[in-house]
Curated annotation (Swiss-Prot):
One GO term describing the cellular component: cytosolic small ribosomal subunit
Family annotation (Gene3D superfamilies): Glucose-6-phosphate isomerase like protein, domain 1
Major localization class: cytoplasm
Known function: Required for the assembly and/or stability of the 40S ribosomal subunit. Required for the processing of the 20S rRNA-precursor to mature 18S rRNA in a late step of the maturation of 40S ribosomal subunits.
The entry's keywords: Cytoplasm, Ribonucleoprotein, Ribosomal protein
This protein's name: Small ribosomal subunit protein uS2
Length: 298
């Protein structure tokens, strides 16, 4: 990292540098745009351009000072058409009070006042100048300053402040937005001092796949066994007014019915019983004719 020209109070901590390296914010692409050369540290033998994270930190602080200078936070619009940055801009907006546009940017948001989503922000922040090119183009028409997360191959046309970082990785994008939000809150005085850690973890800014989250926790239903319900309850046949099961098996569908069936099955089916034909025989001395009702006389 190159020597910093910032005051000592703004120097990054060792934890900040470790987080930037762990999130691979320093790894750019194999292509290099001419305007991004000042932020280049070196090129690896495999052709990957390495970004100077010292420059990344300086630009994060510069962008935070610009954001904190705007009186109304709602006049700041954060935009991300890239899926990896949509969760980050929503969290940034909730923590700083900015206006978020996560997903497709509707053409005319900044230039066509007839549209319902028309906005007049004083500053916009985009995740990727390439995917958010429409927003940058419209901002240039109405003289709106632009802050952008730029990779080594990102176009910098109409970008006023470029934060050099890896804008294609989910962790890199989330970390830069998290650092930017933390610095804004520090400059506004929301955080007491720079020695106090922010209680919001950086994981909240990372992209999460909805399908992966749904498949992560799959709970299989099962019927409680005798060990879960209790041997005493089965032996007693769940005698009581209610069929509630007290124990680990409570709340499992079909537990009481299964236990009662097991108790009934314990009884012997070989018990001696009476003849069903004998019980239905007519009493001796009584004729069937006598049992017929007398005919009514007309």
């Amino acid at each position: 990292m190159a020597p910093s020209q910032l005051p000592p109070i703004f120097n990054p901590t060792s934890q900040d540098i470790e987080m930037l390296l762990a999130a691979q914010c320093h790894l750019g692409s194999k292509n290099l745009q001419s305007h991004m050369e000042p932020y280049l540290w070196k090129t690896r033998p495999d052709g990957v351009n390495v970004i100077n994270i010292g420059k990344t930190w300086e630009k994060i602080l510069l962008a935070a000072r610009i954001i904190a200078a705007i009186d109304n936070p709602a006049d700041i619009c954060v935009i991300s058409a890239r899926p990896y940055g949509q969760r980050a801009v929503l969290k940034f907006a909730s923590h700083t009070g900015a206006t978020a546009i996560a997903g497709r940017f509707t053409p005319g948001n900044f230039t066509n006042y007839i549209t319902r989503s028309f906005k007049e922000p004083r500053l916009i922040i985009v995740t990727d100048p390439r995917t958010d090119a429409q927003a940058i183009k419209e901002a240039s028409y109405v003289n709106i300053p632009v802050i952008a997360l730029c990779d080594t191959d990102s176009p910098t046309d109409f970008v006023d402040v470029a934060i050099p970082t890896n804008n294609k990785g989910r962790h890199a994008i989330g970390l830069v937005w998290w650092l930017l939000a933390r610095e804004v809150l520090r400059l506004r005085g929301t955080l007491a001092s720079r020695e106090v850690d922010w209680d919001v973890v950086v994981d909240l800014y990372f992209y999460r796949d909805p399908e992966a989250e749904e498949n992560k926790e799959v709970v299989e239903e099962k019927v409680a066994s005798a060990e879960e319900v209790g041997a005493g309850a089965i032996e007693s046949g769940f005698a009581g007014e209610n069929w509630d099961v007290a124990g680990a098996g409570a709340g499992v569908p079909g537990t009481a019915f299964a236990a009662a069936s097991a108790a009934a099955g314990a009884a012997s089916w070989e018990a001696e019983g009476g003849d069903w034909a004998a019980s239905s025989a007519a009493p001796a001395g009584e004729s069937w004719a006598e049992a017929q009702p007398t005919e009514a006389k007309w």
